[in-house]
Curated annotation (Swiss-Prot):
It comes from African swine fever virus (isolate Warthog/Namibia/Wart80/1980) (ASFV). GO terms for cellular component: host cell cytoplasm; host cell nucleus; virion component. Coiled coil: none annotated. Interacts with NACA (alpha chain of nascent polypeptide-associated complex). It is found in: Host cytoplasm; Host nucleus; Virion. Keywords: Host cytoplasm, Host nucleus, Host-virus interaction, Late protein, Virion. Induction: Expressed in the late phase of the viral replicative cycle. This is Protein H339R. Belongs to the asfivirus H339R family.
Amino acid sequence: MAGRVKIKQKELIDSTVKNKNVMNLFHEIIGSKGNINFSVVWPKFKKIKQSVYDYISTLSVLEKASVMQNFEDDKKLLELFVQKLWAAYEGYFKYPEIEKYEVEGQVNFNLVPQYVLEKFSQLYRIRINSELVTLILNSCAFMSKYNDYILKKDPYILTITPGLCFSPIPNFEDLNFKHLYNSDKNSQHDKDFIMFILYKLYMAALGVYNAISIPDIDVEDLENIILSSVSQIKKQIPRCKDAFNKIESSVHLLRKNFNTYYSDYVGSGYNPTIIMEQYIKDISQDSKNISPRISYQFRTIIKYYRDMIATKHQTMDPQVLNLVKHVEKKLDMLDREKN
């Protein structure tokens, strides 16, 4: 059954490629024009939301714990900080628009009203790039330096780290685990509890990081778009078989290197062209023995796109233009290496 679904999905993409501009399709898959793949993004968002909730809840448990009765000033400051985090959570994540359409954890997005989907799309990037999520990611980055100690709940971490303060939360040194742990007021049970809180805080922060790192894209859909578009275009450009074969045979590089491509995509401020740029770069680097004939065929394909755009009196997207220039530059470099 799963195989049939994938075949039908590819047939749908093949049909769609015939009727849409390939770059527009790419933008839709990548989500750069406000379109997002809900079947991929919604589960990702739920994981982020749950992990953010767990992070704040862990701090809330610490704030209410009996051990904090020994640190009255710290408790008050932590209470105020947790209140601010909950307020931010309510503002960014307490939206049940799609959740109420879930049945046993699954959503048929065809049954969700369009205005609900549009609202989620508009807020999605704002939510995952919010100050709250950024704070937790920075917290994760700090704690990850002491990964082995925290996972083992080893208090030695509070000895080897420099200074008098060990605060896993950026700009909130009032939560000083060294101060809490080393107090003479604590029993061994209290000390174990403090290390457990640090562990849970790290697990929640890791949960946010791991969820954020999940691509918003179905890589298989992206592969199918590339293959289907090549299949359509090569019928219109004769005597470029070798170049098209090279593109088709190199699609495996997309899946192999996709995590790196996606990291570059996020780091570029969600510029979708960066994925294609890096992909083409890898094709050229993987093709050091490319012949002048294949190089000429690549140039013919590029010229076809230029002529097609000019014929339709369309303005070339600056990102697409940069992509074309990147390919041409790479071909020039390969040509020079041959001479």
